[in-house]
């Protein structure tokens, strides 16, 4: 389905599930909406932490149509999360009645893009084969602070065979708007992950620890996580896995 | 002289002239200070126009020491310009008594860095040989707008021999924090420059139009120019050519 049609199916609430695997070749994006009062510090945070927060578009205050998608961001994602004072308030399927003229919207690259490139290059991704959401972990790797925004990096993990790792590094480092090369390879404890089978977000995957090595990439959940630390009166984000599908073709 | 000592000579007002040619190998930066109310839109403008406005550091509100220089930006530049409502108010040698807790400071790459690389690669720069400030021109090339910040690009011009141009492109495209590759080669009129001998900023240089081709690079005067269009109640910048000398070595 073309992105425009797909987004219309969300707008009409025909479909409200995950966007994983939809609209092949089109860039999907994490979305975070904050009141303008927070916008400068958050944009600076993203600029200082490009691996976790690769900015692909910013909608100035009150703007509801991105440059990279002929969409209305208030209705064209399948599911949204509304956070108040750093706590999840509720999940909704549109945010029309929540919209404010001082809202600034940030669109941030996601790993769907580089996963496709890995598979096309013959690298098997176990979470896809096991039909699970990729496992994500809080780490002890500090992000670079910007104003009130500070916290540690969240990473996603893919368990690879040793001979695939070099290739995976080379492939993903090209995707600057999709988290780039891995931030750690091999030892979960070194980056503060105590139990690889107990991810903080997403789902656990089964893999043979003797045959595969865990490889960690910066994850787009980082800015959401750091945003919540600041406890803004309101922050709106896509529900995990329920991304904005853009009209922009993925970089090759 | 080491950057720290050099900056102390500005702080003590022993020297208040241009920083051109000072502290070889250390990065110099354009500086723009705006009230926080403008900071988000200006940062977004820079991010959308990286060739004109390559951000090398941002100092959050009230902060006076950059990450890339052990300096006090209120005293450690040789000369400052204070603009009010889009008009030059005065030139001063420090801004201690003008400082406000809501000031946000932006440091932006400058072309001193790539000029050095050009010379090291055997390319003669006429404005240096003629001891003039590089000629700069307003163009008809629109910048990408961000909020209230909009306007056309300002470019600097270096007249090169035809066989030097390819090399100059290759050298400068590596300097992403120093304006990168040229934005136009050859025809000044095509980018809205009516008289190459009458620059809008800097000084005119003499060159044989039959033997040399004008090559244009995005220029760090662009953000100052665009900033003034917005007519902020106050905006402070370095005086042209009187840059912040940082402690950071230039990229190679």
From Swiss-Prot, chains A, B:
It holds the Pfam family D-Glu_cyclase. Belongs to the D-glutamate cyclase family. HAMAP family: Hydro_lyase. Its EC number is 4.2.1.-. Transmembrane segments: none annotated. One of its GO terms (molecular function) is lyase activity. It comes from Oceanobacillus iheyensis (strain DSM 14371 / CIP 107618 / JCM 11309 / KCTC 3954 / HTE831). It comes from the Bacteria. This is Putative hydro-lyase OB3382. The keyword Magnesium does not apply. The lineage of its organism: Bacteria, Bacillati, Bacillota, Bacilli, Bacillales. NCBIfam families: PRK05463.1. Keywords: Lyase.
